[in-house]
Amino acid sequence: MRIQYMSDLHLEFQENSRYLRYNELPVTGDVLVLAGDIFYLKDKTAPVMNFWKWAFKNYRQVLIVPGNHEYYNYSDVMERGFQWKWMLRENVGYYQNQAVRIDDTDFVLKYALGAHQSE
């Protein structure tokens, strides 16, 4: 299994969404891990973006982990709870504090909000 990684797509910005509409990203993996800052969780248009159709067609599985920007735009971190899953397509989903097994590989998907950083 080949794993491809991306982060910080920021699809909440029209310029980024427009760019991806006309500039297809290279597909180099079977599984795509999107590690945070993809779109605002409260954005009602985000789940129907063309990007998810593309991801659905090009990857066996797309695993999305929320980053800090997912909670921007007045979204309460604890509103969804400590552990949750939100499927955008059959093979495309957000995972918070979840383990997903694909073949013989376990993906531990979590974002530690408010982690202490030493100075």
Please give the residue ranges for each predicted region.
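A short, structured active-site edge motif that brings together acidic residues
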Residues: 63-70, 96-100
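N-terminal active-site segment of His-dependent metallophosphoesterases
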Residues: 1-63, 71-76
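Active-site beta-loop-alpha junctions enriched in small/polar residues
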Residues: 9-10, 69, 99, 112
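Conserved catalytic scaffold of divalent metal-dependent phosphoesterases
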Residues: 82-119
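Short loop/turn segments at strand-loop or loop-helix junctions that form parts
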Residues: 35-37, 66-67, 109-114
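Generic alpha-helix signal with a bias toward terminal, lower-confidence helices
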Residues: 18-23, 67, 104-106, 119
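Rossmann-like NAD(P)(H) cofactor-binding subdomain of soluble oxidoreductases
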Residues: 74, 81-82
